[in-house]
Amino acid sequence: MIERGKFRSLTLINWNGFFARTFDLDELVTTLSGGNGAGKSTTMAAFVTALIPDLTLLHFRNTTEAGATSGSRDKGLHGKLKAGVCYSMLDTINSRHQRVVVGVRLQQVAGRDRKVDIKPFAIQGLPMSVQPTQLVTETLNERQARVLSLAELKDKLDEMEGVQFKQFNSITDYHSLMFDLGIIARRLRSASDRSKFYRLIEASLYGGISSAITRSLRDYLLPENSGVRKAFQDMEAALRENRLTLEAIRVTQSDRDLFKHLISEATDYVAADYMRHANERRVHLDQALAFRRELYTSRKQLAAEQYKHVDMARELGEHNGAEGSLEADYQAASDHLNLVQTALRQQEKIERYEADLEELQIRLEEQNEVVAEAAEMQDENEARAEAAELEVDELKSQLADYQQALDVQQTRAIQYNQAISALARAKELCHLPDLTPESAAEWLDTFQAKEQEATEKLLSLEQKMSVAQTAHSQFEQAYQLVAAINGPLARSEAWDVARELLRDGVNQRHLAEQVQPLRMRLSELEQRLREQQEAERLLAEFCKRQGKNFDIDELEALHQELEARIASLSESVSSASEQRMALRQEQEQLQSRIQHLMQRAPVWLAAQNSLNQLSEQCGEEFTSSQEVTEYLQQLLEREREAIVERDEVGARKNAVDEEIERLSQPGGAEDQRLNALAERFGGVLLSEIYDDVSLEDAPYFSALYGPSRHAIVVPDLSQIAEQLEGLTDCPEDLYLIEGDPQSFDDSVFSVDELEKAVVVKIADRQWRYSRFPSLPIFGRAARENRIESLHAEREVLSERFATLSFDVQKTQRLHQAFSRFIGSHLSVAFEDDPEAEIRRLNGRRVELERALATHESDNQQQRLQFEQAKEGVSALNRLLPRLNLLADETLADRVDEIQERLDEAQEAARFVQQYGNQLAKLEPVVSVLQSDPEQFEQLKEDYAWSQQMQRDARQQAFALAEVVERRAHFSYSDSAEMLSGNSDLNEKLRQRLEQAEAERTRAREALRSHAAQLSQYSQVLASLKSSYDTKKELLNDLQRELQDIGVRADSGAEERARQRRDELHAQLSNNRSRRNQLEKALTFCEAEMENLTRKLRKLERDYHEMREQVVTAKAGWCAVMRMVKDNGVERRLHRRELAYLSADELRSMSDKALGALRLAVADNEHLRDVLRLSEDPKRPERKIQFFVAVYQHLRERIRQDIIRTDDPVEAIEQMEIELSRLTEELTSREQKLAISSRSVANIIRKTIQREQNRIRMLNQGLQSVSFGQVNSVRLNVNVRETHATLLDVLSEQQEQHQDLFNSNRLTFSEALAKLYQRLNPQIDMGQRTPQTIGEELLDYRNYLEMEVEVNRGSDGWLRAESGALSTGEAIGTGMSILVMVVQSWEDEARRLRGKDISPCRLLFLDEAARLDARSIATLFELCERLQMQLIIAAPENISPEKGTTYKLVRKVFQNTEHVHVVGLRGFAPQLPETLPGTQTEDTPSEAS
């Protein structure tokens, strides 16, 4: 008998109160006894933590804070640990006598969350002598030890031979090892399984009936029938796949035309665009090359035009420069002509003004004399009038003063003052400071004499002035003439300068007479010089055009050479046109031939495509039409052979299908009617009873029962005798065996076993010899083995049948393809390749184009040479007549010499013209210049001084006369004498005043009349002077202008100037004409250059754009080609016949296909989006993506399980071959896969019966369990009424609901859910889907209701609830349920684990003091009978008689808390003894 595994010990390291404590566990019950806070719950928590190290589940509630929720940070574990490394280890021994230590390393994590870090580990192969505490501690001295870390523990165990240490990163791996080694009873695969296990432990720990377990007893007690559910799921998956395949076939059948249309239009749409881009790429390349050639040609033309432009610009610049000089010369000549004409007019004016001036000079001299006489008389009158005026004023003043003195008392004083004033004035004027009134009279006589003397002297000077004035005017006139001719000079030099001027005037007149002959000679020489310069210019221009310098002697020979060259070039140009015409004619012929071949090429390419497809399909190469017809005959023979083989394979496949169907019957019944009969008789098929027989025993039992292996085992044969009457729906031989189906054995026969055979003694006189079948089918294992081999054979046959069917269809389609090829393309398929001929002709055409370009270039060069030669001859024709001028080298010197002589003669002519009249006037009066009458000026000064002296003497005499007259005022007599005297004086004054006023009036009248006459004379003189000065100034201006003009006007000057101007005008006109020609040519050249530049820019832009487009297109084309090659669609898209269509035709073809595709993919969102994206003309790769997407879509639609190819085009060809065969095959497969509703009901019923029997066996183990008033505990299992109705309908009334189970739209699970809803409309299904409900209905556990019942006192059997039981009864009942769950788990796990392992059984019970002694004893008895270990925690009043008891007391020693532990074993019959391996006191030690 297999021994059950046991937990040997529990070790706590560095827990709160336990530094290093090992609890040896009893084989039955281990009791932890102690008061509150002794450490019982800590010890159990350490055990649970080592058993289930899942922090999401661990929750030690009795040590957490009050009112704690599931969200508390501390789950009760953090406070049970000490700081540092902690361990909790379980030492176990399993059924194989293997010692296994499992445990966890715990460590508090710093922080306010009070977290704990847990690491599970396991140790195998540890010797029995090594204690767990020795592994994880290191002794430092007698009273100190140190806890090892997990890494140190690993290193320590690695040094021990044969010991294995495993550390786990997941709890699942940890529990998997514990399950495999028999430490726990159930494999905990998931967190849900761990949660069930923890709830089980928690329920046992805290006691009572756990509602969490009783509510879900089905999950704890009933094993999940995963095999059945997996079978249903596989069946449904197979059916779903089968139906999807059938649906795909139907869709494919319905969409076959759509596929063809989609592929055809997609191919047209993409291939047309693909070939259009290929053509455009080739066209763009050709255009880019053409642009580049044209660009190079244009650059050459532009360079030539630029050279030509430079030459013409240089020549134009020369002409412009020459024109500037000619214009300047012409303008100078015109100006010179104008100056000559102006000088002539000026000369006429000068002569006229000079005559006028001579006349005005005479009149002016006469008028001067008249004015001078009048002025003298006027002076005398003014002096006389002034003296009269003064005398009148004086007298009036005296009379006024005197009158005033008479009227006023101060008259005398006033008169006295006036006398004093007159005396002072007289002193000042006469310069007599000693003058007195008495001496005034004497001095008056003196000064009157001086006045008389001055007057006489003035009259004598006037006479002298009139005599000297005449001589002075003649000298001044001659001096002015000399100064006018020579310029300013000293008066003493006038005589010498005048004689020199008269001599020089004679010489100048002689030179002036030579001007006209010299001018004529100079004009002739200048004309020849200009002709010589023109000839030199023509020669230089000719040399520049020829690019070489020529001597004068070489020009005639060069002229003959150029004429000969012109003749030869003319012949070459005329012959070049004929050669060009021949080349163009050949080019047109080639073009016509290429066009013809391009029209024939598509037909040939279509034939080649068809031929290539035939070659690919048949794997043969055809070189002639005869080979094609011969291969067609071979195809017919091959088709007949394939049809015969296909029919044979189909017959064998049908036989295998029938055998598989027969072996696949539920329960092993080969006849479906046997299941109905077994259910009708209330029996079980014999094959179903032996359904679990192994594959090794199957041949024996198959031979043992022989034909009766399909018998029905019934409990009582007598009860079915009546049912056999009238039984017709049954096999020919129906075997019935009496026996209990639950405990049936093979003792019904007497059997002798032989070698690979048996002898069955049916009766005394009837034996049956049966050999072991080579292929047994008795038992599920044998049937499954046989079905598996048949399935393999069927797969081979199906594959072979499909291959043969496909080959037949392929051969038939190949035959049709050959027939179409022969009818359409055989006549042209084997002709020569037109594309090769096109390539050859294109090469020749390129050569012709190159030859034409070379010919055009040569012809252009010859034309240019011809034009240059003609221009050279024309230039030489102008040069040759002027060779003598070119040879005359002294012409310029002679011109310069004559020019100098002419300049001298012209200067002399200008001198004579300017000063001739002055010299003529000077010659008669030159003699007066010998003596200078300078005394005339002195005489004038003396005369002026005499006049002043006379005026001063007159004033002095008048002042003295006044003093003399006022002598009386200096002394006064008495008043009477003064009045009398004043009266006489007044009278005298009045008389004098009247005389003075009369004199003044006469003087004024004389002055006025003479002043009017003087004014008239002065006006006439001023008028004459003004006229003379004006004409003199005008004459001077005219002479200055004539000098400024610098031209000597003579009779021939105007004619010469006009002739010179006309010559320069002719030259200027010729120069301008040539310049205009050059400007026009230059403008034309610039326009040509600009056109060429624009053309060049356009060509460069077009070339760069085209090149960029080519490069971009190349990148895009490379991407397209890569995509095409990667997806293997080049053969579909590169349709060479489309290369001969125009871009418009291809675009039209693509657009038509696009319109058709839009309709075709309107219902497909993905293809519609891809098609919309592919319409972008700038992204051609998107059309390839669309084509690939279409292929991918078709691949997905066609499915590889139907048609084995990746090419949708080939798939469409294969589609018609496969569709009918697959439809038939899949329909039959669905019928075979579909399970009947009755079979499902039978499977569920049998599973329920089996589990009910198992629960019944579990109840037998709980019948003797009693707690207080509870006499017994049991599990009650019932089938739910709604689910029982469902099973009855599935078994008996399935025909009424075939609309659900025969629907192709519903799976079996969904149909089952729909039926459940139909039968139970009152049940609310919530949000669950029919598939989910159906899967639940396929689980037998959902058909059962389970509840725990107790037999309590007089109440009998009632439902176990905590409210109806006492605390002890509830604890005992709950423990019984937990034991049942553990046993159920062991039974379920026995299939998963080795047969030689019986797992450990251990439960907990905290606060066991709530149980009485009888209940405790019952627990001990239960543990003993079930070989279960139990750990109980109780106060000190619990003293079990059996098991092991540990008394725990928590103490504090030197501020250190520790738990004192004493262990006792079975103390009732014998004295207590200390358990080995325990200490009387757990001495704490300090960690180093």
UniProtKB/Swiss-Prot annotation:
It comes from the Bacteria. One of its GO terms (molecular function) is ATP binding. Residues 326-418, 444-472, 509-602, 835-923, 977-1116, 1209-1265 form a coiled coil. GO terms for biological process: cell division; chromosome condensation; chromosome segregation; DNA replication. ATP binds at G34, G35, N36, G37, A38, G39, K40, S41. One of its GO terms (cellular component) is nucleoid. Residues 666-783 are annotated as: Flexible hinge. Residues 1049-1074 are annotated as: Disordered. It is found in: Cytoplasm, Nucleoid. Pfam families: MukB, MukB_hinge, SbcC_Walker_B. InterPro entries: MukB, MukB/SMC, MukB_hinge, MukB_hinge_sf, MukB_N_dom, P-loop_NTPase. The hinge domain, which separates the large intramolecular coiled coil regions, allows the homodimerization, forming a V-shaped homodimer. Belongs to the SMC family. MukB subfamily. Plays a central role in chromosome condensation, segregation and cell cycle progression. Functions as a homodimer, which is essential for chromosome partition. Involved in negative DNA supercoiling in vivo, and by this means organize and compact chromosomes. May achieve or facilitate chromosome segregation by condensation DNA from both sides of a centrally located replisome during cell division. Homodimerization via its hinge domain. Binds to DNA via its C-terminal region. Interacts, and probably forms a ternary complex, with MukE and MukF via its C-terminal region. The complex formation is stimulated by calcium or magnesium. Interacts with tubulin-related protein FtsZ. This is Chromosome partition protein MukB. It comes from Salmonella newport (strain SL254). The lineage of its organism: Bacteria, Pseudomonadati, Pseudomonadota, Gammaproteobacteria, Enterobacterales. The gene is mukB.
